[in-house]
Amino acid sequence: MKKRRSKKERQELLQQTIETNPFITDEDLAEKFQVSIQTVRLDRMELSIPELRERIKHVATKQHEEDVKSLPLEEVVGEIIDIELDRHAISIFEVKVEHVFKRNQIARGHHLFAQANSLAVAVIDEELALTAKSTIRYIRPVKLGERVVAKARVEDVENGKGRTVVKVRSFVGEELVFTGTFEMYRSSNYSEEGNNL
């Protein structure tokens, strides 16, 4: 029989878990620590840890409008919460009723693709960035009410074809649900290569 953690030990682990993953839900924390959601909420209150929505806003306080060059922020699918141009970016997409099939409440795949693709465009440090090629894989269906966290990483700024390779991995909680590799065309290549995509 597994020994229950003390309140102090649980709260320390809860704090570490939230610091590592500020987007984790109270439900996921309750499951992880095998306690009720109310216990998680009380622990958070005692530790002065805000609820998920406030944590997301806090992480997103950085002004990304000035950071993103390749498209207006309102054209990004999901909310960018972290970005370092030509290096990495993170966005969050809440799956709502308008994003799912009515019959089974599963998100339409083009929304997951759009989140990943727009993040791959946004992370490029250019005025113009277009997707030249993509290879994608849906790993499991995403359902109504789930929160998709997409993480983009620039792997190769100028590959042999003069393109930038961006890899995107999307998660629900800690579960991988989508992957994509995007070859991105950059505006600096346009002036160097003429009109060739």
Curated annotation (Swiss-Prot):
GO terms for biological process: fatty acid biosynthetic process; negative regulation of DNA-templated transcription; negative regulation of fatty acid biosynthetic process. The keyword RNA-binding does not apply. Keywords: DNA-binding, Fatty acid biosynthesis, Fatty acid metabolism, Lipid biosynthesis, Lipid metabolism, Repressor, Transcription, Transcription regulation. It holds the Pfam family 4HBT. GO terms for molecular function: DNA binding; DNA-binding transcription factor activity. CDD domains: hot_dog. InterPro entries: HotDog_dom_sf (IPR029069), Thioestr_dom (IPR006683), Transcription_factor_FapR (IPR017275), WH-like_DNA-bd_sf (IPR036388), WH_DNA-bd_sf (IPR036390). The keyword Signal does not apply. Signal peptide: none annotated. SUPFAM superfamilies: Thioesterase/thiol ester dehydrase-isomerase, Winged helix' DNA-binding domain. Transcriptional factor involved in regulation of membrane lipid biosynthesis by repressing genes involved in fatty acid and phospholipid metabolism. Belongs to the FapR family. This is Transcription factor FapR. The lineage of its organism: Bacteria, Bacillati, Bacillota, Bacilli, Bacillales.
